[in-house]
């Protein structure tokens, strides 16, 4: 039997006979989310236990977190989805963020963060390729000038040491370093979102694309802005959920059969 529900929050319009467990899940979903998530509904048609597990994860790892507000969780989920190129998943969380009162400028802040983190991830190869570049005796700029800029970055960010990939980038291409700093200034300067939330979302994005050095930098900045370990834990739970959930959002076409 095919299903053609196209949105995350959908009304039941097909003649399925639901079990008591699925009816209980639906009632709870409507009271907390405003409707039944499509993927849980589809899973329940095939296997109730899988649907129950998905609903448990949705509640315990995502919208049931206690220390980051639901609006920020939804914006974070959207940003993580965008960082991983998951358009359909991003739309799901965009709509949830709207339901929780997110303004369009907050949506744009979250999109900007995702873009910054994904672009910054290209620096992950800089330390590896630096020896190859050095063999050619190519210098991007005067070492004194580079060191001045790096010292300023370290002072302004209050970091004990600069990321190795950033230092390598400066040696490989002064122009790319300058571009990175321009992007950082623009994309990590929010319209209305708090700077703390910007760094928490950036941390989640970096974790999701598996860029440890980037994640370390943004987590440090998050703590400097007053973030807590509990909020960090919420972000890690959410990132784990959204990362694994990609398999289900990609499988909705299969589950509709």
Language model region names:
Residues 3-70, 122-197, 219-224, 247-257:
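Acidic, glycine/proline-rich low-complexity segments that act as flexible tails and inter-domain linkers
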Residues 54, 58, 75-80, 110-117, ...:
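Short alpha-helical scaffolding segments that buttress acidic/His motifs in well-ordered protein cores
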Residues 68-71, 101-106, 193-194, 226-230:
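Helix N-cap / loop-to-helix initiation motif
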Residues 76-92, 121, 201-217:
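Short, thiol/selenol-centered motifs that function as redox-active sites or metal-ligating centers
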Residues 90-98, 127-128, 217-220:
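"Short basic amphipathic alpha-helical interaction patches in structured regions
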Residues 93-117:
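Hydrophobic/aromatic-rich structural module bridging two neighboring secondary-structure elements via a short loop
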Residues 112-116, 125, 143-148, 227-230, ...:
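C-terminal binding/interaction regions
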Residues 189-228, 241:
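Structured core of small recognition/catalytic domains
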């Amino acid at each position: 039997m095919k299903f053609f529900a196209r949105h995350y929050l959908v009304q039941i319009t097909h003649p399925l006979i639901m079990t008591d467990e699925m009816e209980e899940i639906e009632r709870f979903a409507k009271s907390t989310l405003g409707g039944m998530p499509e993927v849980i509904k589809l899973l329940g048609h095939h296997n109730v236990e899988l649907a129950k597990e998905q609903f448990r994860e949705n509640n315990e790892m995502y919208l049931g977190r206690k220390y980051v507000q639901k609006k920020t969780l939804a914006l974070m989920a959207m940003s993580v989805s965008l960082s991983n190129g998951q358009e359909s998943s991003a739309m799901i969380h965009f709509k949830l963020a709207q339901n929780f009162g997110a303004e369009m400028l907050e949506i744009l802040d979250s999109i900007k963060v995702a873009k910054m983190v994904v672009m910054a991830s290209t620096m992950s190869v800089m330390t590896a390729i630096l020896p190859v570049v050095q063999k050619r005796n190519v210098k991007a700029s005067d070492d004194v000038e580079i060191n001045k800029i790096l010292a300023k970055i370290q002072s302004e960010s209050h970091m004990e040491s600069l990321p190795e990939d950033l230092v390598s980038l400066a040696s490989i291409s002064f122009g790319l370093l300058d571009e990175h700093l321009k992007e950082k200034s623009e994309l990590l300067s929010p319209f209305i979102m708090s700077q703390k939330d910007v760094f928490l979302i950036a941390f989640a994005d970096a974790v999701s694309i598996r860029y440890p050095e980037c994640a370390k930098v943004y987590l440090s900045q998050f703590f400097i802005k007053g973030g807590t370990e509990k909020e960090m834990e919420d972000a890690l739970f959410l990132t784990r959920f959204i990362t694994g959930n990609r398999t289900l959002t990609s499988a909705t076409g299969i589950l509709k059969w």
